[in-house]
Amino acid sequence: MKNIRNFSIIAHIDHGKSTLSDRIIQICGGLSDREMEAQVLDSMDLERERGITIKAQSVTLDFKASDGETYQLNFIDTPGHVDFSYEVSRSLAACEGALLVVDAGQGVEAQTLANCYTAMEMDLEVVPVLNKIDLPAADPERVAEEIEDIVGIDATDAVRCSAKTGVGVTDVLERLVRDIPPPQGDPDGPLQALIIDSWFDNYLGVVSLVRIKNGTMRKGDKIKVMSTGQTYNADRLGIFTPKQVDRTELKCGEVGWLVCAIKDILGAPVGDTLTSARNPAEKALPGFKKVKPQVYAGLFPVSSDDYESFRDALGKLSLNDASLFYEPENSSALGFGFRCGFLGLLHMEIIQERLEREYDLDLITTAPTVVYEVETTAKEIIYVDSPSKLPPLNNIYELREPIAECHMLLPQAYLGNVITLCIEKRGVQTNMVYHGNQVALTYEIPMAEVVLDFFDRLKSTSRGYASLDYNFKRFQASDMVRVDVLINNERVDALALITHRDNAQNRGRELVDKMKDLIPRQQFDIAIQAAIGTHIIARSTVKQLRKNVLAKCYGGDISRKKKLLQKQKEGKKRMKQIGNVELPQEAFLAILHVGKDNK
């Protein structure tokens, strides 16, 4: 056991985690050169295309160190995006140490900080690594000082490497073997294994990634899930060397995969403890804290026949993604679907794309909203995650919106732009600290403004240099109203949005204008209105298409023309009564872009 090292790699987006993982795998001979490809661990097509890591992946490698010993390295590559930070905290729970990778050109960024604090809270040994030293812009001395200044760990002798060229990667491994402690645990005690991650395989059922904390797990053992008390047979187990390799046992301190032929998706939840049925452990390991979704959106299948397969797909996906929340919902405009909760907009996009790709579904998404806390006049408190669930205005005593605490790190040059942006987003500054050339800003900004497009706008006002990390702080009373959209005097529930009263007029007007461009012209006039309660705040009309009925009259009599026009008018009137308007998917997404283009 003293030769096992469990660690994960944490860093900000694009600081080179996945590339470093590739080099480590290559040096330790996990894959032959022929099988080696860029970003081996980003196994989803989606991860490759966007160049980001979404799921944490684990690998077991053997490394022969300079002291002659062979060490078993179990390492986990983690995502860097703030939307996937729960993936990071789960991976860290399975480790004794973490490599903090910092780009020697960019320096410390907000996510570096957030992930590093998560690791320190879990009492992990953090080993700083300066990556990308082959870049002409690299300044390792400055960045080492920055790490000490901002993060507060000693980085004077931080390992310097370039994952792209492979320089210094062996030093990283040597340092890691030296500094990260071996796992603690009792190899002879009763079995306790923590489920770090699970996914669904069509042939094997549920596959779980486990970290053995105490005891040993052998193939063929009877295994008990501690939260449900159900027992299963350990049919197959093994490790990833990125390839799936079968083993006969997993020893104390190791990380590996396990197949127990669990067909029920909820059979082995992530964060649960597995123990042996014969000699069970007394208590479960501390799991993970549940993450609360920050953004909710309705997902509906385009054709209602897909509802069943959509439900199964969501079930399988939520096994793999512990933070996805969903409950059935129906909408008068879109039929049956699900209300899903996500950690952020990127998370929502990824889930939607995964559902469409991996499970072949066609989906319509409604605009995302955050959760509001409503105190009714009867002094009840309810939580509303969809505009259609908002009680009537005269029943609301107070409406409170969620406030996010945003930590931003940015170069001084862009401070003015960023502060202007935060004020425009109704932000309140709570702190500002200068670290050398960097400024650490803390603002309290309404969550609704943060999840909408704050990140994109922050990046564009600071030319990509600012970085953001946010978390939910509290609910705060605010003057929010619901803007409804009426099409031909009928409310479309999927188009409603909740916004601040000061912005309501503008948002309503913009939304109506956007709708006008997006709804195709019909044979009759379509009236689009935005309303707060019964008060109409904006209106616009999509003009009808009409045939020129007079084309066949040469010069003819005026009464003849009048008769034809009158006939056409009556036809249109009849059509308008029975006609219904098909809304394209773009119309539902238009709400997202309200407030973006006029800045």
From Swiss-Prot:
GTP binds at residues 14-19, 131-134. Gene3D superfamilies: 3.30.70.240, Elongation factor 4, C-terminal domain (3.30.70.2570), Elongation Factor G (Translational Gtpase), domain 3 (3.30.70.870), P-loop containing nucleotide triphosphate hydrolases (3.40.50.300), Translation factors (2.40.30.10). GO terms for biological process: positive regulation of translation. Its main location: membrane. One of its GO terms (molecular function) is translation elongation factor activity. Keywords: Cell inner membrane, Cell membrane, GTP-binding, Hydrolase, Membrane, Nucleotide-binding, Protein biosynthesis. It catalyses: GTP + H2O = GDP + phosphate + H(+). Its EC number is 3.6.5.n1. GO terms for cellular component: plasma membrane. It is found in: Cell inner membrane. NCBIfam families: lepA, small_GTP. Belongs to the TRAFAC class translation factor GTPase superfamily. Classic translation factor GTPase family. LepA subfamily. Required for accurate and efficient protein synthesis under certain stress conditions. May act as a fidelity factor of the translation reaction, by catalyzing a one-codon backward translocation of tRNAs on improperly translocated ribosomes. Back-translocation proceeds from a post-translocation (POST) complex to a pre-translocation (PRE) complex, thus giving elongation factor G a second chance to translocate the tRNAs correctly. Binds to ribosomes in a GTP-dependent manner. This is Elongation factor 4. It comes from Salmonella arizonae (strain ATCC BAA-731 / CDC346-86 / RSK2980).
